[in-house]
A protein has these predicted regions:
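Terminal helices and disordered tails flanking the catalytic cores of nucleotide-processing hydrolases
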Residues: 1-14, 238, 258-292
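Conserved alpha-helical "signature site"
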Residues: 1-170, 177-256
Length: 292
């Protein structure tokens, strides 16, 4: 009689277990830019000089500066000129978003593209809400960009397993029964770790600030986040899904006005009444960076 398979062997791993050591490093220019932004001596010129040291980032900044999104821009030919036109805040946004795009470039599949667009949309929304609420705009944008970095990590190192995760959750979306916890459970079952924990480990390996790591680890647990800027990421993530920038396997579960209620009062009054107007604004900003 053939012995039955033990529970431990019932599911053979599709690929090697997830290991952050097998991931490529995040672009050094973007990480250095983050350090500049978090330091007391950071300045527009510091950031400009950093960008000029890398050809790819220089081209990205010039393309954004010459895009229709930037008013009065025409024939911007130098990074310094682009920096003065864009300003520190917007320049920082371009560097971080382009850094994430460069990070996933080798595997820029439709899945990765959707994850990237979702992250940028979340970052833009969080930054706006922070600005309107007099909170930390830099932190809000950075947290928005990195909140789903764990998905990128899992999809990069375990593409077959993560495709199964997405397929399973997409089926739940079609049946209109998906919940945020379903994705995390599927990730843990098929990959051995969920994207929140994977993101936490990855950002810790990159030696990023503890406050940022905590947001990435807890962005699906609003109550676990401290007050202030950190609380903007969860509604920004959900809002980006509602506006049409959902990552594969995700679906917005609430209406526009319900999500708005989770933002600070000062931010709620500044968001457009028309959801389509907001979606169009975000799409234009993403397109400007995407084409860089």
């Amino acid at each position: 009689m053939t012995p039955s398979a033990s529970p431990a062997k019932a599911r053979e791993p599709l690929e090697l277990p997830w290991d952050p050591e097998r991931l490529p490093p995040f672009p050094a220019i973007a990480l250095k830019a983050l350090n500049l932004m978090s330091g007391t001596d950071s300045s527009l010129i510091d950031l400009c000089n950093l960008i000029r040291s890398d050809a790819a980032f220089s081209v990205a900044v010039l393309r954004v500066a010459n895009s229709p999104l930037v008013a009065f821009s025409k024939n911007v030919t130098s990074v310094l000129q682009a920096s003065m036109l864009l300003g520190f805040q917007r320049l920082r946004s371009v560097v971080i978003a382009f850094g994430l795009k460069a990070y996933v470039r080798e595997a820029f599949t439709p899945l990765m593209q959707s994850c990237w667009r979702h992250s940028v949309a979340c970052a833009i929304l969080a930054e706006r809400a922070a600005r309107w609420s007099f909170l930390d705009k830099d932190f809000a944008y950075t947290a928005g960009i990195f909140h789903d970095i764990g998905k990128v990590a899992l999809a990069t190192t375990m593409p077959k397993a993560y495709t199964r995760v997405v397929d399973r959750n997409s089926e739940l979306v079609r049946e209109s029964v998906v919940q945020p916890a379903d994705l995390l459970a599927s990730e843990r079952e098929l990959c051995g770790i969920d994207h929140c924990e994977a993101g936490r480990l990855l950002l810790a390996a990159w030696d990023l600030p503890p406050a940022l790591i905590n947001v990435v680890a807890c962005h699906h647990e609003q109550k676990a986040l401290a007050s202030g800027t950190s609380t903007l990421i969860s509604p920004s993530c959900e809002m980006s899904e509602l506006l049409g920038f959902a990552a594969p396997g995700a679906k917005p579960l609430r209406r526009y006005e319900q999500i708005l209620a989770d933002f600070p009062e000062m931010a709620r009054s500044r968001f457009p009444v028309d959801m389509e107007e907001l979606a169009s604004e975000i799409a234009k900003e993403i397109q400007a960076i995407e084409s860089a």
